[in-house]
């Protein structure tokens, strides 16, 4: 089987597609819902592999995330860099979004291509509240990334004092 070239999109179509992803970035739930009702795929991804859910969650739009999850958007769909929406929310320290994604079925142990979990992201960037929530949802303290780093080791490497303290406590 040969790879067929991707179809070229005209400028009008390209602009429409760009606007779709802007709706997610901006949290325009009303317009997105209209389009989802008309058959817009909830797992549509852009040229970077970012899904509508990834963009809405990264930009903190809880209502849009709830909408996309209701339309069966995959909370574990990774972008081309291998990142999940949960890891993005953990990196940003958005506790409410982390909780929402977990409630929507996100895998607490879902790792990127280099083995980094959401707990590792929270640990590295000193997001102690998020790290505590992830631990409460079953994130593994002993998980290792491709370099063999645990969340605690990653936090130490980044001088993330609050998460070092949290992860150093007996569990």
UniProtKB/Swiss-Prot annotation:
InterPro entries: Ankyrin_rpt, Ankyrin_rpt-contain_sf. Keywords: ANK repeat, Repeat. Pfam families: Ank, Ank_2. It comes from the Bacteria. ANK repeats lie at residues 48-77, 81-110, 114-143. This is Putative ankyrin repeat protein PA3287. It comes from Pseudomonas aeruginosa (strain ATCC 15692 / DSM 22644 / CIP 104116 / JCM 14847 / LMG 12228 / 1C / PRS 101 / PAO1).
């Amino acid at each position: 089987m040969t790879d067929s070239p991707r179809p070229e999109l005209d400028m009008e179509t390209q602009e429409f597609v760009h606007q779709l992803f802007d709706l997610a970035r901006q949290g325009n739930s009303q317009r997105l819902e209209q389009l989802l009702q008309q058959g817009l795929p909830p797992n549509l991804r852009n040229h970077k592999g970012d899904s509508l859910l990834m963009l809405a969650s990264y930009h903190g739009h809880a209502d849009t995330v709830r909408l996309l999850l209701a339309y069966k958007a995959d909370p574990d769909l990774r972008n081309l860099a291998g990142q999940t929406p949960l890891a993005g929310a953990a990196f940003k320290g958005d506790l409410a979004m982390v909780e929402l994604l977990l409630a929507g079925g996100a895998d607490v142990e879902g790792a990127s291509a280099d083995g980094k979990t959401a707990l590792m992201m929270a640990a590295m960037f000193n997001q102690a509240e998020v790290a505590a929530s992830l631990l409460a949802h079953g994130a593994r303290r002993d998980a290792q990334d491709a370099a063999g780093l645990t969340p605690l080791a990653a936090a130490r490497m980044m001088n993330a004092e609050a998460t070092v303290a949290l992860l150093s406590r007996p569990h």
